[in-house]
Amino acid sequence: MSSAEQHTCSRPVVLITGPTASGKSALAHALAKAINAEIVSADSRQIYRGMDIGTAKPSMEMLAEVPYHFINEKEIAEEYNAGDFTSDAMARIRSIHEKGHDAIVAGGSTLYIEGLLHGFSQLPKKDADIRRRLQEELNTGGAEKLYARLTTLDPEHARTLDPSKTQRLVRSLEIITITGKTVTGLRAAEHSRLSSVTFIPFGLSLQRNRLYERINTRTDAMMASGLLKEAEQLYERYLSAENRATINALETVGYKELFQYFDGIHSLLRAVELIQQHTRNYAKRQLTFFKNRLNVQWLAAPENLKELHEQKEQLITLYSKT
């Protein structure tokens, strides 16, 4: 067996996750530089070009220092889901290992993490008729009605979804209608397919009030860095609200609130407050997911460069023992 083949078979993959604004990206980058690894981004929005500030993408300097995957690989209007990511990421990890490099997965998109750790079945393609009927139900009865139905049919999966993410809600019910099986059940059937890669998951944790402070501060920093201009450029490309509603990426927190500002629905101050509120809500759902679905080793989220260095060294020590 070649050294590359031995590496592919033997090297586990460090997975760093945690709620938004917990410092995952900085820790993963520091670790990757230290062990000469490549980073697989498990962020469902960083894959899209043109959404840089609002998704907290790695800087150009960081991208030059470490090889990153699933950053700026898709156009915003392209459809890309967790099932696609799971298959692509597993293939990409194997390719990284074949080169003799280590891979680090970093991100907090719960469906992406779920797919890697627990698997996804080969989900059916979209059915235009079923989707149209569900969309009509959504338009007439609202998201609450569809979410209530999903909660009845697949409560475990429903708990992982944000009811306001209507495209995911419609897709979940579409899958159940087509297959006659729950999304939870389909994922369970897929779990064994992932046995070729062993993940060592770590999660970053911090007190809830401190996390919320970080979220508020980061939102202000994004606005100061040009998020309003970035959102305006997207708004001008996808002018109508109806057009934006058909593109899942444009439902991203940080953009949709500013689109509403451009539509005259909110003041700018209120839009920023909503970004902070919705991001806090998202972090809360992430924490619920991590608690209920993941078996991870928790680390204190670093608050400064000294703590970041200490966490990096701790991960290197733990990884060297695998």
UniProtKB/Swiss-Prot annotation:
Domain of life assignment: Bacteria
Binding site for ATP: 18-25
GO BP terms in the entry: tRNA modification
InterPro entries named in the record: Dimethylallyltransferase, IPT, P-loop_NTPase
Entry EC no(s): 2.5.1.75
Region (Interaction with substrate tRNA): 43-46, 167-171
Gene3D superfamilies according to UniProt: 1.10.20.140, P-loop containing nucleotide triphosphate hydrolases
Organism: Chlorobium phaeobacteroides (strain BS1)
Functional summary from the UniProt entry: Catalyzes the transfer of a dimethylallyl group onto the adenine at position 37 in tRNAs that read codons beginning with uridine, leading to the formation of N6-(dimethylallyl)adenosine (i(6)A).
Pfam families linked: IPPT
Cofactors required: Mg(2+)
Assembly notes: Monomer.
PANTHER family: TRNA DIMETHYLALLYLTRANSFERASE
Keyword Phosphoprotein in record: no
Keywords: ATP-binding, Magnesium, Nucleotide-binding, Transferase, tRNA processing
Site (Interaction with substrate tRNA): 109, 131
Top-level taxonomy: Bacteria, Pseudomonadati, Chlorobiota, Chlorobiia, Chlorobiales
HAMAP family noted in UniProt: IPP_trans
Catalytic activity: adenosine(37) in tRNA + dimethylallyl diphosphate = N(6)-dimethylallyladenosine(37) in tRNA + diphosphate
SUPFAM superfamilies from the UniProt entry: P-loop containing nucleoside triphosphate hydrolases
Record family assignment: Belongs to the IPP transferase family.
Enzyme class per UniProt: transferase
Single GO MF descriptor: ATP binding
Protein name as annotated: tRNA dimethylallyltransferase
Residues reported in the UniProt entry to bind substrate: 20-25
Keyword Nucleotide-binding: yes
